[in-house]
């Protein structure tokens, strides 16, 4: 039996999406601690995964994500609404007791170049 109490979540941690009234972004911006990538959505091939793991494929690179609530990220990727993915910082592992849980979070983010 489902609870009748609606659970409140804070926004996803380490990814940002467009609002409903905004245009879709032209590219996906991936921010790592020491490097940044910009992948045009026109070169997007597919995304695959589940709640704790997502792979995003482009012709030259793969973006590998681990975390939780990533099924929400897959929905946003399918709609091309994701503007930015950020590598997690140490502070992201802590939150105040009175803060609502994020709907999902990226805990590890890796970009791999595809070798031909």
State the predicted function of each range.
Residues 1-22:
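Anionic N-terminal interaction surfaces
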Residues 14, 65-116:
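Helix-rich interaction surfaces within compact, conserved domain-sized segments
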Residues 19-21, 36-37, 46:
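Short, conserved, surface-exposed binding loops centered on an aromatic residue
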Residues 21-26, 48-52:
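A short, compositionally biased
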Residues 45-47, 61-64, 71-72:
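Short, surface-exposed beta-strand-loop junctions and turns on beta-sheet-rich folds
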């Amino acid at each position: 039996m489902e609870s009748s109490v609606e659970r409140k979540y804070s926004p996803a941690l380490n990814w940002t999406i467009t609002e409903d009234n905004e245009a879709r972004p032209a590219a996906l911006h991936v921010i790592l601690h020491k490097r940044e990538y910009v992948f045009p959505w026109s070169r997007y091939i597919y995304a695959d995964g589940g709640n704790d793991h997502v792979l995003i494929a482009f012709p030259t690179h793969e973006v590998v994500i681990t975390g939780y609530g990533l099924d929400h990220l897959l929905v946003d990727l399918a709609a091309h609404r994701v503007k930015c993915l950020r590598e997690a910082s140490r502070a992201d592992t802590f939150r105040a007791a009175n803060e609502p849980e994020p709907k999902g979070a990226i805990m590890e983010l890796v970009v791999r170049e595809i070798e031909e």
